[in-house]
Amino acid sequence: MTQHESANSQPSAFSLTFGDNGVAWLKIDVPNERMNTLQSAFVDQVTDVLAQLKDKKDIKGMVVYSGKPDNFIAGADIRMLAACQTADEAQQLAAKGQELFGQLEALPFHVVAAIHGPCLGGGLELALACHSRVCSDDDKTRLGLPEVQLGLLPGSGGTQRLPRLIGVANALDMILTGKQLRAKKAKNLGLVEEAVPLSILLDIAEKQALKGKPKRKGSFQEWAMGGNALGRSVVFDQAAKKTHEKTRGNYPAADAILDVIKYGLQHGMKKGLDQEAKRFGELVMTSESAALRSIFFATTAMKKESGSDALPATIKKVGVLGGGLMGGGISHVTATKAGYPVRIKDISNDGIKNALVYNFKLLDKQRKRRIISKAELQNKMFSITGGTTFTGFTNVDVVIEAVFEDINLKHQMVKDIEQQTSDYTIFASNTSSLPIHQIAAAAERPENVVGLHYFSPVEKMPLVEVIPHQGTENGSATSEQTIATVVALAKKQGKTPIVVADKAGFYVNRILAPYMNEAAAVLLSGEPIEHIDRSLLDFGFPVGPITLLDEVGVDIGAKISPILLAELGERFKAPDVFDLLLSDDRKGRKSGKGFYLYNTKKKEVDKSVYKLLSLEPEQKAAGQDIALRCTLMMLNEAARCLDEGVIKSARDGDIGAIFGIGFPPFLGGPFRYMDTLGAKRVVEMLKDHTDKYGGRFTPCDKLVAMANEEQSFYS
């Protein structure tokens, strides 16, 4: 393949070369950027490049490919949206993207997208405007339209081209969830024609380009969804119902996606594109999209932070103490995501067996879904070993402790690890309630001791709290290198770490406890369990507080509550339900007995719990009032945490609440939500609730001062 570079005096993201066989090559390589992202300025660049093609009469086809080693196009640069002052301006941005891809689609010869790495958002919309697509079968390759996760819809033709390519039902599933497809799945759906090894990707794309333009394949499904009003109605009704169950009306982008796809099928491509751009512009201006985009920018910024000025130490092997649910999950993300060999220590062979079985089941699910091969499963399992002694711990660099919440046991673990490992081995405790400085009190090298608080289930929950201590009576504080090392480890495990202060409850449990306590107080006032849960689900939480108590375990709540009460005062006093529940062996799901019935087909409240608590349930309060009552406790405590230095910033507090608890993402986190309400309004509501329910609602000094000064958490 001989290529001749075209003259181009301006630095452009798009460059053309021509092969002797009639194939043109359009390379996308955004200057000075690690990833290709699309920008509005590219419309003129593409127009210039396509103008060069008009002078060439012998072109038989064209391959569009990336000049970056590991990504096609990661999406549009969403920083452009922040500059939009009106919906019309945002609509024009979408229209520009549509124009750019329309020019590509209108070319008279066969245009093939050769995709390797992430092909997301505007990147996939560009690929959809090509006449064919081939992709590498590499694990790095992902195809998707994740705009809904930013409170948006695909605005450059995605809502119109994707349903016409893979059918309405599949397109709705992709666009409404924002899911990213691996190569094999993309091929099965017909999103790409071929999924091939990277080494031959461009050769296969070239052969495709030399063939004539493909004719669109009709299918019964396409006819039913595009031309049959009844069939179309059924699919959209089902999608709308399923979507509303998830979003509960809190995400306007989901409704807009359904409307725009339906409109395009009814009125044709041109009108569909116009409607897509219009609704895109409207969504950019919503508070929900602004909040979701703020989360995206926050997490992007946090990926570049190390939590410390020091460089992280090199990690080659990790030890895990405890083979329970947490230990099993921690070993899983350490071995399979971070890629480190893991040695597990437990007091019994059953504990080791449980951890290994837990890992096998998670990996076998991936094998069954053909995400990994049998050989890959075996290799990953080989990297996780265990035993009842400290054999294999001599050369570990980090030990993550996940044993029972008992200070004496944790002290023994610290001593054992210091005896069995090197002077540099880090001891990271997964405690959810015990102060790290108390654990470090037993250490000869307290500078190596740090908190590393994961959330259950570890393999799913994205947050981890990193808790350095400020020193013991006889020793120094957690070292900067220790902090940097565990932050780096957490990132490799696929987690978003936030560094929080060593104070009771740390951050997440501290803001969660008053919220949960208030939900229990609402229950004791006689409100039905399902009404309380439904109220918070409607507000936007992923699970209701009573369900959450069942899932976490009533015994865990009972253990943490006294610690918070002793350290933080009466506002953390839990309602008198824990002892009653535990006396009846109601620990929640783990004991098969809690607020809800288990081992039943349908989720139902265990009505015998009302008798145990001497309650006659009756729905009196409005759902919105219950949601506000519980959430205000969380907001007030979050503001206190920032004021006391438990968290470093409002941004960290928002990410911690969203990723650790599931605070409604469309509200942007507790601090952004308080900014939306205004500090003055928050204080007024807290005072109103103080009058109704007692002193625990007294607004904290930070909020009162902010209300008086008309300040906000974000400038």
Curated annotation (Swiss-Prot):
Transmembrane segments: none annotated. It is found in: Cytoplasm. Residues 313-715 are annotated as: 3-hydroxyacyl-CoA dehydrogenase. The keyword Lipid metabolism applies. InterPro entries: 3-OHacyl-CoA_DH_CS, 3-OHacyl-CoA_DH_NAD-bd, 3HC_DH_C, 6-PGluconate_DH-like_C_sf, ClpP/crotonase-like_dom_sf, Enoyl-CoA_hydra/iso, FA_oxidation_alpha_subunit, FadJ. GO terms for cellular component: cytoplasm. Gene3D superfamilies: 1.10.1040.50, 2-enoyl-CoA Hydratase, Chain A, domain 1, NAD(P)-binding Rossmann-like Domain. The record marks 125, 147 as: Important for catalytic activity. It catalyses: a (3S)-3-hydroxyacyl-CoA = a (2E)-enoyl-CoA + H2O; a 4-saturated-(3S)-3-hydroxyacyl-CoA = a (3E)-enoyl-CoA + H2O; a (3S)-3-hydroxyacyl-CoA + NAD(+) = a 3-oxoacyl-CoA + NADH + H(+); (3S)-3-hydroxybutanoyl-CoA = (3R)-3-hydroxybutanoyl-CoA. One of its GO terms (biological process) is fatty acid beta-oxidation. Pathway: Lipid metabolism; fatty acid beta-oxidation. Keywords: Cytoplasm, Fatty acid metabolism, Isomerase, Lipid degradation, Lipid metabolism, Lyase, Multifunctional enzyme, NAD, Oxidoreductase. CDD domains: crotonase-like. One of its GO terms (molecular function) is 3-hydroxybutyryl-CoA epimerase activity. The keyword Nucleotidyltransferase does not apply. Its EC number is 4.2.1.17, 5.1.2.3, 1.1.1.35. Residues 8-197 are annotated as: Enoyl-CoA hydratase. Its main location: cytoplasm. In the N-terminal section; belongs to the enoyl-CoA hydratase/isomerase family. Catalyzes the formation of a hydroxyacyl-CoA by addition of water on enoyl-CoA. Also exhibits 3-hydroxyacyl-CoA epimerase and 3-hydroxyacyl-CoA dehydrogenase activities. Heterotetramer of two alpha chains (FadJ) and two beta chains (FadI). This is Fatty acid oxidation complex subunit alpha.
